[in-house]
């Protein structure tokens, strides 16, 4: 959904052939991808030709950037039934946990995921945190293991089959910011400063890996420790 989240020009002007949705799907096929995730419009425009060649995942909501002044909210652009009708096997959505809009987003996506499961579709949640208060004393706790872990836990509560989460880079967000509830054992026994342990806690809060976890982001270069050893060896802890 880069064309919505970052604008079509910003996303595709460097490689104009990707203004054509067919080329996005062709790239996924050539790259051996196991699915292609995009918007209702992108996938719907080429579904007759490609839906039987590679699994489609329709992203249901987006944060569009044409609103001025800029705001951060996930708005539903598509329904589960629209995704199903074009031949998609999965739907995805983003919730900005911690934001003022989170409660509404939770209700919307919980309802959408319930419908998707009625139709036998897979559900994927981008369980991202967003609140300016999550930055304190120069530290960005949007990537704290305890807070992202709770985002994961909320996501699996509405039956996300797969959670997409930013890689944890620090910990102790609850206590440093001074809100919510936690337990000393989270920091003394269940985690350490090691990147793999931070990822393990994200897996633990995803029902001990019963829901799959995909990490994105993390520190650049060698600091990502091979993406925290491929998300703690593909969620086997």
Describe these PLM feature segments:
Residues 4-213, 222-237:
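Alpha/beta enzyme core
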